[in-house]
Amino acid sequence: PLNIQPWSVLCKDSCRIDLYLDKRRLLSLMDPGSRQACISCGTFIENLDIAAREAGLRAEISLFPSSWPVGDIDPGQPVAEIVLVPDLGVVSDPLFAWLETRHTNRSIYTNDPIPSDIISILADAANQPFTTLGFSAEPSFRQELSTHITDAMEITFSDRDRFSEFLFHVRIPPISAHQYSDGYGASETGLDGVRGWLSLLPLRISPAGLRNGLARGLILRLARKQAESAAAFGWIATKGSSRHDQVRAGRTYERVHLTAASAGLSLQPMTCVLEPYSGMGDHYRRVLDLLGIPDTHTVQMLFRLGYSHSSS
């Protein structure tokens, strides 16, 4: 979440790796249950597995080897233990070629539709058990889901402390002074080019006491445009919501994103409506109904897809 990569790696030797959640990078307000952080661990594992195959190695992955996780995760216990084993029979993954290309694109997408055969290719990207993947490009569906996503963003940032946590990791000048390599800047938010410069101008010339409110309005307007420009939406659901489910959802998401990159598609997660914030429950239930997901299942990821002229 927010490009903070909330994990750390312990290399026991050249072939043994332990993956941990990094408690210094967890978002206590944006991601209160560390669900997104576990999904992020899944994306790391999938990337490692793909890269290992390219090197002729088989990745033997054991999730939560120390104990079955219940409730909050103990940062001292590994999320995964990974052993890399040389294997002449391992098959390389064509998605390896897109590891460095794949990135989250938060710009406004074009009006170009996604061909149905591309959607089918994306749907075939999933390979994790107990995980379902869905897509829809139907106009009325997109309009209704866009409304829920935008309303969810308003609920998310109605909490001042939660918005402050967001601003700490998103460098919007002149508000954010965060200079570390994690998070992302204004251009990666989708505020790039002349339009982005003009959008940020009121923040630059306004008194400091007004800037957070102006930034909130700017981010909400941008989120609405982002959602409304989606050529399609995709989602990943699991039957439960155990930590294993969350990691598997992350692996599925990474394969979908890499496959999208290979097809020239842009992708952006839009997951606020999935979070257990106060006031979000009704929107989440309506999204479940819209997606056709039973309330005994959990939507782990929700994302928009489309084509973009910008690399942001």
Q: Could you tell me what each predicted segment is?
A:
Residues 1-312:
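Acidic, surface-exposed loops and disordered segments
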